[in-house]
Amino acid sequence: MVVKLSCIENAKEFCKIVSSSQYKDIDIDLQCGRYVIDAKSLLGILSVDLRKQMKLVFHGEKNDEIRLKKEIEKFLIDE
């Protein structure tokens, strides 16, 4: 999945979704160039250029990934 957050408000909303209790035991990362960032860390997300596309790497069950994809649909972009 590829996401683009564009602004601080979108980054906050995205971080709130991936940090929710249903994903608390699942590692979710964002890859931006050579950097890999914990997607649950707002500070980490804000440390990269929000104008760039980031690859979301989900380390969990497929059904959880499908649920997350629906929740973050507005941040997803075509690859």
Please name every model-derived segment.
Residues 1-6:
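Short amphipathic
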Residues 49-79:
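C-terminal structural segments of small proteins and small subunits
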Residues 29-34:
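Short, glycine-/small-residue-enriched flexible loop/hinge segments at domain edges that mediate gating
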Residues 26-28, 54:
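Conserved beta-strand core positions
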Residues 10-24, 35-50, 65-71:
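Amphipathic alpha-helical interaction surfaces in cytosolic regulatory modules
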